[in-house]
Amino acid sequence: GEVIEMGRIAIEAKLFNDIVRKLPNSEIFIETTPDYNTIIRCEKSKFVIPSKSGEDFTELPQIEKEKSIELSQFSLKEIIRQTIFSISDNENNKLMTGELFEVKDGVLQVVSLDGHRISLRNLALKGNASNVSVVVPGKTLNDLSKIITGGVDDMVTVYFTDRHILFEFENTIVVSRLLEGEYFKIVQMLSMDHKIKVRVNNRELFDCIDRASILMR
């Protein structure tokens, strides 16, 4: 894109996203008026939407980039996909609406649970990784998975503080507050003293469950 004149404006995110999604695949021109209206033009389409001064927009918190890990966008997207389904939507227990991100001895462990299911995913990290343990809101991870490309060679750097988590990739920065509190002791929940243990082909198991689920509708 080309910046003709520098400036700042605050636009309602959902409205702006809905407009851009409906526009044709062509050049988009965005300009603002002195009374903070934003004009969006694309081919024969024109939208005029109310906005606010960019000075009123909340600044991103200053994140100290001391504790961090790096992994591929593919790995992060897969981790979220394999764990996000077992977070809870019950706001009465905030910790269950998030996922535990714990880094220890060079291994990232991501855990989610909703009181009925537990999902756990481990990933060996390359290079030096800071030991951390934080709970990330599920909504943040769900939104993040929609905007990362998932490329194997595209990297994401994740920074941790006591209150925030920051994801940095390409030209994008995503910052989120963390959920407060101590996460559940997963090791105590996962007893390894199994009387019966089976090993099955995951594709065949998925197909069986998929067929059986027809009768549950």
Could you describe each region identified by the protein language model?
Residues 1-217:
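Structural preference for solvent-exposed beta-strand-turn elements
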